[in-house]
């Protein structure tokens, strides 16, 4: 299924007030959004940033099961978009004493993304989906720039607070 697919990565995960989480996926050419629930957005962020977890999450458990059974997550493919719903496939390579084969399993894109990040497996989107989605690169750049500006303002406020704490009132 590598023919007709485009390599992508998770570019950003942003919480959208009262609507869940926006996962920005794409490459240097284009970016699109998949909305997921806030918990899944948090899991994807944890895998993306390599944040350690006290106990295994569901996707960690799946990864441990894959490891125990000599199953490798070869790649994930976001392969369809129907009525604003994305569909995806896990491409697994089984190579153990019982089986030697490649399997495709239908899965939610959010689970595919989390598992790909956890297993450091490549992610792809079908050409059909790629051509159908709207490019959100400018939106992501705008949001990122706004967040950076807010962060800079927060740092300036904190510095002002420190000056006030250390030397009286800031003017």
What residues fall within each predicted segment?
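Divalent-cation
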Residues: 1-171
